[in-house]
Each structure stands twice: as structure tokens, then as C-alpha cells.
């Protein structure tokens, strides 16, 4: 069994446990916060993730790609320069967030301490990214797997202890829920860095080649900037989406409180359940980026095509049964959160969104590994423009409302998957059935 398959299996098993824990975490949140509180929690979360994405600078991807493509003798010098770059960028990001957050109106309706939580997350996420990227690049997926499970265990334990022993007002309960995220990320930081330090000590006696800081920054940023742009775009869309959905529902005649509740059912229940199988897709993505990067750098295009086929067959193998189960048992699954017929209805209607989302992640990993980050970004822009436009136009129709929102989500995900797949087939000079040549011309534009 090669490293690629081993990495997928290891990460998938760990991610399964992590997703099970995440499922329980969301059940606790749903019961403790209630429908309205869950809507508030899910509405602020995308904005927090947007700030975190900017702080991380997508270093896990750029560092893992550098490590996979380059001589091991270059790794130590690259890591030193990456630390310096991260320290400078983190100082700037923390200062900028401290100044800007008080003026962001999204936080006005929440506990004032939430701003401090977000600021505290910035350095934690930034420095964790270096260790995470290193272990991804050397394909030591066991460290990543343990970190992912550890994060969910700490989050679950903290939530259980806080809500078991104490009773909070709604705004304080939301604050506690977000504070737990910081605690779990700090624990992951400590674990990964302890492993990272031991790994570097093991390499200390080996010969290293010195790199210029300018060259390292240029190479890392060549990947980090477009992938960060892609993540920022996703985070911006996710931050806008709650307000766009609520705005569309208000235009359709739905009351404000009911609109928040419906969005809580959509994002907090239906999407949470539907996204459960995505732990395998995410595992595929993490393993594929360094694997595709290494093969593409060595012009081993047949290996790239092999990895693509493997990812598609794996996705078909688990994706179709998973979506079928969610459709058939939507009622019992949604009742684990709330006894809400709306959530069951949303989960069943979103099956195309969930199925195609499972394909998007490995396809996007293939594009990133091949160096087509810009193409991936354009695909996301166009698909989200179509999706958000449809969501607002159809969602604001009185006879459609949430059905229109879901139609827009499904259409956008199908379009994004199709664009990714078509670009990869064109790059590898193969047909849509993945047959033909494997010599790769560079895509321009």
C-alpha cells in the first residue's frame, strides 16, 4: 500500500471520528442555544472564519507544496524564512484587526468580548499553519489526523463542561461557544509544535542548503496569495450568504425572526448533516495536493491522471450511498437536532449540493497541485455569482422562498464541479471519460 492510499485511509478514519464529534458538538449547540441562538451562531461564524483565513495566509498549502516539490536539504532554510514571514504578517494582522473590528457592524449585536476572541485566534492559526503545512508536505498524515481529532475532543469536552455546570444568557452562551474554538485551537498548536520541534531536531545533523529569503517568500506567496484569495472569496461569500438569505426571505414576506430561524435550520441542521461525508473529500484534498505537486513537478502526468481517477472512484464509492442514506432518513437525522419538518425538507432538496461538493474538493486539490490556482479561483467566482444571484432572485419570490435559495445553491455547486473537471481534462489532454494522452500543456490566462 503506497503513501497516497495510506494517507487517505488514515486521514479518513481520523476525520470520521472528528466528524462524529463535530456532529455531537452541533447537537449540544443546537439544544443549548435554541433555534434563534443557532441562527446567531451560524451567522457570525463565517465572518470569524474570514478573518482567520486572512491570518493563516494559506501557508499549509504553500509550504506543503514547496516541501513536496523540493530537495529535503532546502526544507530547513525555507522553514526559517517562513517563520519570519509569518511573525511579521501576524503582527500586522493582529494590529489591523484590533483597529478594524470595533467598526465592523456585524459584531454590534453580539457580546463585546467576541472581538477579543477573534484577535486571539489570529496568531494561533497563523503559527499552527507552518507546522501543519510541513507535516502535509512530508506526508506524515498521522500528525494531521491526531490534531484534527484532538481539536474536536477538546471542543466537545469544554462545551459539555460549561453547559453542564452553568446556565447562561443567550449572548453569553454564544460567546462561550466561540471561546471554546480558541481553546481547542491552542491545544492543537501546542501538540503540532511539540511534534514539529522533534522532527526538526531529528534533521539537525543533516546538511542544509541556504536559500535567500526573497526567493522563499516569492515561491511561497506565488501559491499563498491566489489560494488565500480563493479562501477569502469563499469566506466573504459565506459571510454575505446569511444576510443575503435573510434579505431574500424578508423580500418574500417572511418575518425577520422567522428568517433567522429558517437560516438556522438550513445552515445549522441541514448543511451540518449533509456535510458529514465531506471528511473523506477533505482527506483526499489534503493528501492529493502534495502528491499531485510532486508528480507534476517531475512531469509524471500519468501519475496525475491515476490520482485523479482514484479520487473520482473513491468519491463515487462513498458519495452516492451517503447521499441516498441522508435522503431516505432525513427525518430521523434532523430530529437529532430539532423536531423540524423544514430541516428535513431542506436536507432532502439539497442532495445535489452535497453530492457535487464531495467532488469539488479533490478536483480543486488537483488544480492546486498542478499550479492552476488562478483557474480554480475564476471557477469559484463565476459559480458563486450564478448561485448568489439565483438565491436572491428566486428566494425573494413569495411562492418559492427557501426552495429558491436551495435551487441557487444546487446550481452553483454543479456549475463549479463542471468547470473544475473540464479544466483538468483540458490540461491533461484527455476526454471527459479520462481517456487519451497525458502530456500537459500549460493553460494560459
UniProtKB/Swiss-Prot annotation:
UniProt KW Zinc keyword: no
One biological process term in Gene Ontology: sporulation resulting in formation of a cellular spore
Localization (cell): Forespore membrane
InterPro entries named among the record's database cross-references: MATE_MepA_subfamily, PG_synth_SpoVB, Polysacc_synth
Keywords (A to Z) from UniProt: Membrane, Sporulation, Transmembrane, Transmembrane helix
Disulfide bonds, paired cysteine numbers: none
Membrane-crossing residue ranges in chain numbering: 7-29, 39-61, 82-104, 109-131, 144-166, 172-194, 237-259, 269-291, 312-334, 349-371, 376-395, 400-422
Entry's Gene Ontology cellular component terms: membrane
UniProt topology in membrane: Multi-pass membrane protein
Extra facts: YkvU and stoA are cotranscribed under the control of sigma E.
The name this protein goes by in its record: Sporulation protein YkvU
UniProt source species: Bacillus subtilis (strain 168)
Phylogenetic placement of the source organism: Bacteria, Bacillati, Bacillota, Bacilli, Bacillales
